[in-house]
């Protein structure tokens, strides 16, 4: 669902920020 995509994007952004 859309929320799953949002969580996935948030995870990728979180990893990229570190």
From Swiss-Prot:
Residue ranges the record marks as coiled coil: none
UniProt entry tagged with the keyword Secreted: yes
Subcellular location: Secreted
Ranges annotated as spanning the membrane: none
Presence of the UniProt keyword Ribonucleoprotein in the record: no
Pfam families registered for this protein in UniProt: Antimicrobial20
GO cellular component: extracellular region
Protein's recorded name: Citropin-1.2.5
The organism of origin for this protein: Ranoidea citropa (Australian Blue Mountains tree frog)
Organism phylogeny: Eukaryota, Metazoa, Chordata, Craniata, Vertebrata
């Amino acid at each position: 669902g859309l929320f799953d995509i949002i969580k996935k994007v948030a995870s990728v952004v979180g990893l990229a920020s570190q």
